[in-house]
Amino acid sequence: ESSAASDVYKRQSLLDRLSGSDEWTTDLSKLKELRKYADDPAVLKELREIKAANKQDFARWIEQRQGSVIDPDSVYDTQIKRLHEYKRQLMNALYIIDLYFRIKEDGETDVPKRTFIFGAKAAPGYTMAKGIIKLINAIGELVNNDPVVSKYLHVVFVENYNVSPAEQIIPATDVSEQISTAGKEASGTSNMKFMMNGALTPVSY
């Protein structure tokens, strides 16, 4: 059994066990059963262990796939969506640049170690979207090779993003960036997948 398949089994068995069945997969009201475990030390410990294992799996996977070496103990801050201006990957990229200069020029060190994970494809004729992908990769080159900033930040653009990489990324994510322009997202569902895998969700409103 593959590591990924094993992790899926662990996550599902935890949710099934806590909610009393697998009915939550078709009836989300069953998730109310989880509320009583919000402060349960044993449950939180198990959840942290599952998340840590998934993060280690992703770190191994991304290194084998495209040579990116990341710290599994860092915060995995993820934005995986079709590349579009309204989805605001550019805003996220500019935030990384801001962090870079705060560390590099201002000497800020009170920064949690963070790995920014992007996954996206651009429509063939969408020049702006392709430019944003190029910018994110350029920021990654700058950040990842800086002897000072790379101690705190790392940027990964997952190549050839599709469903298969998502199966590796989503279980490992700590922070799920859902920052599309308010009112523009017709029917986003990836946020739910992240939530069911224990990710925190900053959102636009």
Predicted segments, located by residue:
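Single conserved hydrophobic/aromatic residue that forms the stacking wall/gate
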Residues: E1-A5, Y9
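C-terminal amphipathic alpha-helical interaction region
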Residues: K30, P41-N92, I96-Y205
